[in-house]
């Protein structure tokens, strides 16, 4: 076998803290060869991102590092900052998790890409570097690349910003690419496009690639080899087929088992690698263990012909209307007692606007919202305040939703205090709430910062349950959680739905999660509901083209299926540009 592009031997990284030394990476070793894609997989805190920063030489100064890292036979730990700078962006490049933070907001995107070319190839003229930037933007699939090159990062969508980051990463044809959670913040369809693009770029360049991720579905379609990390150490490594079909370690099996499968019904999923963890969550659409038929159960929430239109204005001193944005455009649905309706769609489709219209309990611009049969526009201020105990919400980011200065007991008591509960009843209720969401009574005295992400989300659910609501709105409640933690939260929600008879409006863009918690699905696009039906009907026989697009974009944790779905999406002719790639290539002399 040829010499590896990247060799990591016995890498250890630690940081000082007020509680002692934190060992972020312990004795990690691996190699990546030319044209090979290695995925480093693990949950938050496993050390995977720290290991990639060590390779790039981007660790903070207080880090203690030992071991050895070689890139093309050169020992990185013996290099100074100047020598490392000549490698970054030229021989080795990185695609970061948050492109908006990685791109400079005050410079045009094209200029930032051109700068990467000229830093490593000063002989290239400014005009040629600018043309090269346009060629690269065209190669990664950005429409109207000449115009887009003159725009700023905030004028790009999230997917376009990540495409621009990939263009920057491949500008000098690096030997090594590191991608750190490149699709975490993206919708499922954009995620699929970005991963196809990254794989196409890697294969075109023949670059060695390290993908850092916690998403096993993404790994299946990208990696040749997989390295699994837990608590700073390597648990298992092997070929992608070996890891997915014949995992040796229990932790690897648990990671795979926790991944929801969008392609399998539960009867099939229970036989698969990924079926076991969610088997006890719910059969798809079987969370309705309520024996009464749906039509005979009372309606908890009814939305009829709802509209929310925002004017588009222009002008500084005198603003004039030049158009309108139909954020919600005539949608209708209802939720019955003990039922979970999933509202799914990409960013900008109107999901969050719909959620806010419901939670504000105010008269809509047009249409009607009824809670327990009562029109919200007919409510007095006092009646509206009382109704807020019937409709509660669990937010996407549990840390931002909980007051860090309040102990958990006070957080749970706050909504009860507003509704006039007695002290004795609140104390009893706090203990019951903690037990109901799988926490311990002693957790009541702790603060949010003392909990993990999954535990904080359980606190958020407990707070939503505090006043016996009829409906809980769940706004992307598991999107910020690791896959194993996500499975536990989903299991808890499904159990609460069955045990307490509470109804859910589950807002999400993750169809694989939705299948295992919802009874019915409403698919939104551009402010409209394009499909509404029972979960299994939508998954097995989607009627709308957009529903089929969403389903086809969901990553499936099966390498064989993922390989069949892979597409080459990079424009190779645009990448080479007029006169070939040498004008901006890392191989230029």
Give the predicted meaning of each segment:
Residues 1-265, 269-589:
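ABC transporter nucleotide-binding domains
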């Amino acid at each position: 076998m040829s010499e590896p592009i990247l060799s990591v031997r016995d890498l250890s990284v630690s940081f000082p803290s007020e509680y002692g030394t934190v060992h972020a990476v312990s004795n990690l070793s691996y190699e990546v060869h030319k044209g090979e894609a290695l995925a480093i997989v693990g949950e938050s805190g496993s050390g995977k991102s720290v290991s990639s920063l060590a390779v790039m030489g981007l660790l903070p100064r207080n880090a203690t590092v030992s071991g050895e890292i070689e890139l093309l036979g050169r020992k990185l730990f013996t290099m100074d900052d100047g020598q490392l700078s000549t490698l970054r962006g030229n021989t080795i490049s990185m695609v970061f998790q948050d492109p908006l933070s990685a791109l400079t907001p005050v410079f045009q995107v094209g200029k930032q890409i051109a700068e990467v070319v000229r830093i490593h190839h000063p002989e290239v003229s400014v005009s040629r570097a600018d043309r090269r930037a346009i060629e690269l933007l065209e190669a990664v699939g950005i429409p109207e690349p000449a115009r887009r090159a003159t725009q700023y990062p905030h004028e790009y969508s999230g997917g376009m910003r990540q495409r621009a980051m990939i263009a920057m990463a491949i500008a000098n044809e690096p030997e090594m690419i590191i991608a750190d959670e490149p699709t975490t913040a993206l919708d499922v369809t954009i995620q699929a496009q970005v991963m196809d693009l990254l794989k196409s770029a890697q294969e075109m360049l023949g670059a060695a690639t390290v993908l850092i991720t916690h998403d096993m579905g993404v790994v299946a379609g990208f990696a040749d080899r997989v390295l699994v990390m837990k608590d700073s150490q390597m648990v298992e490594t092997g070929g992608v087929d070996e890891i997915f079909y014949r995992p040796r370690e229990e932790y690897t099996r648990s990671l795979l088992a926790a991944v929801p499968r969008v392609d399998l019904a539960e009867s099939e999923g229970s036989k698969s690698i990924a079926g076991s963890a969610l088997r006890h969550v719910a059969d798809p659409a079987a969370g309705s263990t309520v024996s009464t038929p749906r039509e005979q159960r009372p309606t908890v929430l009814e939305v009829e012909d709802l509209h929310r239109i925002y004017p588009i204005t222009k002008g500084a001193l005198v603003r004039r209307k030049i158009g309108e944005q139909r954020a919600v455009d005539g949608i209708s649905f209802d939720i019955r007692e003990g039922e979970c309706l999933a509202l799914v769609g990409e960013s900008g489709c109107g999901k969050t606007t719909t959620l806010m219209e419901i939670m504000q309990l105010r008269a809509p611009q047009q249409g009607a919202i009824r809670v327990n049969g009562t029109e919200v526009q007919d409510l007095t201020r006092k009646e509206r305040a009382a109704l807020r105990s019937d409709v509660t919400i669990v937010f996407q980011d549990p840390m931002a939703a909980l007051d860090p200065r309040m102990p958990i007991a006070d957080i749970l008591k706050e909504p009860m205090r507003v509704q006039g509960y007695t002290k004795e009843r609140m104390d009893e209720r706090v203990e019951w709430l903690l037990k109901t969401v799988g926490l311990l009574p002693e957790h009541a005295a702790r603060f949010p910062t003392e909990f993990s992400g999954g535990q904080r989300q359980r606190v958020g659910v407990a707070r939503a349950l505090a006043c016996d609501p009829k409906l809980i709105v769940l706004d992307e409640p598991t999107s910020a959680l690791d896959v194993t933690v996500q499975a536990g939260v989903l299991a808890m929600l499904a159990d609460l739905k069955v045990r307490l008879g509470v109804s859910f409006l589950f807002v999400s863009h993750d169809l694989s999660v939705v299948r295992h918690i919802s009874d019915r699905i409403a698919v939104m696009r551009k402010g409209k509901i394009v499909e509404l039906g029972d979960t299994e009907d939508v998954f097995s026989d989607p009627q709308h083209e957009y529903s089929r697009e969403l389903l086809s974009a969901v990553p499936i944790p099966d390498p064989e299926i993922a390989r069949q779905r892979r597409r080459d999406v990079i424009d190779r002719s645009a990448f080479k540009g007029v006169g070939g790639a040498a004008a901006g290539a890392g191989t230029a002399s």
